[in-house]
Amino acid sequence: FNILNHSNIIDFNIKSAKVLDLYSGVGSFGIECISRGANYTVFVEKNKETSTVLEKNLCDLKIDNNKFYITNNEVNWYVQNNKAKKFNIFFLDPPYSDQLYPETLKVVKESKMFLNKNLVIIHRESGSKEDVSSIINILKVKNYGRSKIIFGTFLN
């Protein structure tokens, strides 16, 4: 989150943001956004056991139920069936073995679920080679050990 607060390349304020946390796992990113003032977060996690841990995390942290929604659907299904919803932060953290996430990103872009001021954050393995430059304008790529974080905005 420091890069969001202190970057001269990424100009984005989390306060009042509407966050779509795809492949959310136990919800670390979305929960952090809520703690920093995001309006709400939608967590999309198809694994029921993992989403149960996510629910427990939200409960343990006493996060207001109006600040989040959890769905146990496939990511692409959620996007296809919720096109009317608009978000300005999109976080994608697919399993490292998932090479198909660019298709998910493309579906999000084509669905027009993003507000004009938006930020896309993708967490991948540092050696991954998937190309998303036809879907997002890549602002910055940061490597952290085995991970890389891609920051961008949807292309119009």
Name each model-derived stretch.
Residues F1-N156:
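Class I S-adenosyl-L-methionine-dependent methyltransferase catalytic core
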